[in-house]
Amino acid sequence: MREILHIQGGQCGNQIGAKFWEVVCAEHGIDSTGRYQGENDLQLERVNVYYNEASCGRFVPRAVLMDLEPGTMDSVRSGPYGQIFRPDNFVFGQSGAGNNWAKGHYTEGAELIDSVLDVVRKEAENCDCLQGFQVCHSLGGGTGSGMGTLLISKIREEYPDRMMLTFSVFPSPKVSDTVVEPYNATLSVHQLVENADECMVLDNEALYDICFRTLKLTTPSFGDLNHLISATMSGVTCCLRFPGQLNSDLRKLAVNLIPFPRLHFFMVGFAPLTSRGSQQYRALTVPELTQQMWDAKNMMCAADPRHGRYLTASAMFRGKMSTKEVDEQMINVQNKNSSYFVEWIPNNVKSTVCDIPPTGLKMASTFIGNSTSIQEMFRRVSEQFTAMFRRKAFLHWYTGEGMDEMEFTEAESNMNDLVSEYQQYQDATADEEEGYEYEEDEVEVQEEQ
């Protein structure tokens, strides 16, 4: 079976992760003690993707939980599904990273990383055919960003041919948790560009907007935000866990979404959006799902796809529906909004269909888009970074942990390069692409003469 190993790090990562396991357990009919309570055999058919079956018939998540302080771990452990995890897979320190990337990446995190890798190795050896890793973390803090990226690079060394998928929560434009978020995020992106295969970009502000605007929640809690994220996470991998007409896995997803290796930061969306309490009673139609899914207000990160163009996109539909209708709707979207898609990648929208809908819904869809407008996120973080770095504000916290100012400069320029790469492909047209080739030929001819 094609297993996925789930890793969650830091406070944010652990809270998202805990919510994710609640959703996946519900989908597979597994209760909080790890016993199967479902009625449908399909729930067990590929339960191995995320679970290891223990000898006593219990299902144990293939999850590694890490943090540099015990607090969040304790709340996960005492949460509704806390008893389902393998106790050895909780790896935590006592010191905390204090929102400092350098502590997570170089000092505190580096001391703990070997024990995390041991657990990862043990879990990977339990797999029949490991497909890849999914990492949940935030980029604004210290542990998720610093230690998270350290772990990703170590796993990259040890398992170079396995997919690395991350769910990364970026600092929000208006809601800031700490002042050094731009530093932590820039240093993390620098790592993610090189070491991750696919990054799902999330941010709290966009999630707040969805909760407030669409779900009509007056005071959204982090629980509500994480509920949205976990619905998307479950949608991304539903094709691996349930049968369907058009299946996809992490690698197929990457092949279809990433035209240039560095441009692997995706916007995600989910439809139908339902508030936690009121699961919708009316069945949606495929056209309605498609429309809601492509809606800019539905994107879970603060970048507006209408300000850029889609290089590629992928949609996963779940529920009983006709593949033909799905294809027609997707082609319809592309024809009506052709200016929002680059014309030099033909057939750049892929759809997959999975027969089993999420719990409580008749149909649902998950959207993943590789849009050039994601540069807005990077641009914003980069501006905040530059504003502080020019004055060398708060830098002693990082240099005190043994970091060099050069690293900051490198990370900054790598992020700016990323922004200009997105911009370059946003502006590129089909004719230009051909034009470049001719120019090169002429140069060669001159040299021969």
Curated annotation (Swiss-Prot):
Question: Where does it sit, as one GO cellular component term?
Answer: Golgi apparatus
Requisite cofactors: Mg(2+)
The record's annotation in CDD domains points to: beta_tubulin
Keywords noted in UniProt: Cytoplasm, Cytoskeleton, GTP-binding, Magnesium, Metal-binding, Microtubule, Nucleotide-binding
Compositionally biased intervals (Acidic residues): 429-449
InterPro entries in the record: Beta-tubulin_BS (IPR013838), Beta_tubulin (IPR002453), Tub_FtsZ_C (IPR008280), Tubulin (IPR000217), Tubulin/FtsZ-like_C (IPR037103), Tubulin/FtsZ_2-layer-sand-dom (IPR018316), Tubulin/FtsZ_GTPase_sf (IPR036525), Tubulin_C (IPR023123)
Q: State where the protein is found.
A: Cytoplasm, Cytoskeleton
Output the SMART domains linked to this UniProt entry. Answer: Tubulin, Tubulin_C
Coiled coil residues, start to end: none
Family in the record: Belongs to the tubulin family.
Q: What else is known?
A: There are nine genes coding for beta-tubulin.
What does the function comment of this entry state? Tubulin is the major constituent of microtubules, a cylinder consisting of laterally associated linear protofilaments composed of alpha- and beta-tubulin heterodimers. Microtubules grow by the addition of GTP-tubulin dimers to the microtubule end, where a stabilizing cap forms. Below the cap, tubulin dimers are in GDP-bound state, owing to GTPase activity of alpha-tubulin.
- Protein name (Swiss-Prot/TrEMBL): Tubulin beta-8 chain
Q: State the organism of origin.
A: Arabidopsis thaliana (Mouse-ear cress)
